[in-house]
Amino acid sequence: LEEGYRSWGGGLGISAALSGIELDAAYEYINWYLSGWVGGYLMRQGYYSAVPETSKEFMSADEWGFWYEGKAAEGDILSPTGNKLAGAGEVRDGGSFFDRMGSVVCWNSVMDENQYMVRKWNEFIAA
């Protein structure tokens, strides 16, 4: 099976053991996380938010066009820390979000090497 594009995913979950104020705080955190600021920060590093539409208001039109729509940058594209990542006229490798995600052919939830890496990590931290 030919792989069209590789992608990573992440998510947030709530422990079934939470209740009361702790459960309320967990939901408040997740709502904040998905409200846009975090997504805008992540997208400036080349990652995507689970709710990209909320990220748009925390990005300039040029940033949104470059990172999400696959458009050529109109000016410098900066990382969240201010480092220049692309200049005017440059386009993101792989195209728009829809082009990139539309090319995913096979989605694996865990890499083949996962168990090996976990064992090696545990050996490292136990040393």
Identify the function of each model-found stretch.
Residues 10-93:
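Mature extracytoplasmic/periplasmic domains
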Residues 4, 28, 60-63, 103, ...:
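Acidic, low-complexity intrinsically disordered regions
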Residues 1-6, 17:
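Short beta-strand->loop
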Residues 81-127:
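Conserved C-terminal helix/tail region of periplasmic/extracytoplasmic solute-binding proteins
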Residues 6-9, 97-99:
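Short acidic (Asp/Glu) and glycine-rich catalytic loops that position anionic groups and cofactors
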